[in-house]
Amino acid sequence: MTTEIRASASPGEVRVALLHDGTLTDYAIWRPGAPDGVGDIHRGHVLKSVHAMAGAFVAIDGAEGFLPDSEGAKGLTEGTPVIVRVTRAAQGGKGPRLSARIGAEPPDIDVSGGVALLRRGPDPITRFVTAWPDATLTTDSQVLAARLRGLSVRIDVVADAFDDALATEVDALSEMMVELPGGARIAIYPTPALVAIDVDSGGTVAGGRDRLGHHRALNQAVIPALARQIRLRNLSGAIVVDLAGMPVRRRAALAPALTAALAEDPLRPRFLGFTGLGLAEILRSRVHPPLHEVLSGPHATGLAALRAIAANLGTDPRRMPALRAAPSIVTALRRDKVALDDLATRAGQALVLRADPDMREGNWRMESRDG
């Protein structure tokens, strides 16, 4: 099996695809100016111990995280300094999850002093290279390639890390409807409590005496694609799936296929069984934010605008436009100095940002710098 890591860089963002034998297997977005923080080591202090939650809230650099008793909070009192590692990124409206179990303390970690970020955790490329050391790494950024020279992997620099087919497949991950070969489709509905997934035959199963058999075959064929979409989109926490067509009592026959498909996922999601309504229950660990959260909000929109501007530049920095956008987008970009500096380096000049209170949330446009 050949394994490839493809890293497509744009200002402030690197889209990272993992492919096995040419098939997209895993996907992540890395924002160097605003990483999700998983694996970061912080020097923090206890804000408040909450016995009802069996843990404590800890102030860390730029955030407030939760340290469970089982991960080292037991016995800590308000104001106590503590070295912690982020084990789960902030997501779903909740702050990061922490652990005081950081393993052997690195020699350069300074345990004295106030709240501070002491060390960054691994980025997605490093994680993929660590898990698949025989992979090849391809990127379209000389700057990124130089930054990654310390990794024990061959790095190739090309004009476009994502070909048209891969770019199309990655772009489709932002859609909540997945069209499958043969006409079936998967609809994904994230909610604050869980992720609901509906499998629809799309009219591919005709009536007749063996309608049940056709639905069973359809679901058997869909299940690997379902597990793949869960992994690519990093859907996590409680996941319930309504499979197509089969009576509730007959769905148990699909349990082995679900278990086998989920076994390929490094996070080892668990198939818990079927509810009384016939919904398949899956539990997948929350670590990094799900893709639909990563792709939403003013920062994500602003970085998409920078990607479009960089693509529009080509090799001629004289084509550098100004960006007019909703104020929330401009504010988010101004906070990401890495992204703005990246674009300025490419263009040889800084981007002019114009906050327009008359523009709706999420809206932006390129315009003349002289306008």
For each predicted feature, which ranges?
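Conserved glycine-centered short motifs in functionally critical loops
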Residues: A54-V58, A90-A100, G182-D370
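Extended acidic low-complexity intrinsically disordered segments
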Residues: H51, A63-G65, A146, P327-I329, ...
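Alpha-helical multi-pass transmembrane bundles of energy-transducing inner-membrane proteins
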Residues: G65-E78, A89, G93, L243-A244
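Short small-residue beta-strand/loop micro-motif enriched in glycine and branched aliphatics
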Residues: D26, G65-P68, G203-R209
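Short, acidic/hydrophobic/Gly-rich beta-strand patch recurrent on exposed beta strands
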Residues: A17-L18, A56-D61, F66-P68, R85, ...
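Extended, charged alpha/beta regions that create polyanion-binding interfaces
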Residues: M1-D36, D40-R43, L47, P81, ...
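Beta-strand/loop nucleic-acid-binding surfaces
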Residues: A28-G33, F57, G62-G75
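Short, structured coil segments at secondary-structure junctions
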Residues: D61-G62, L151, A347
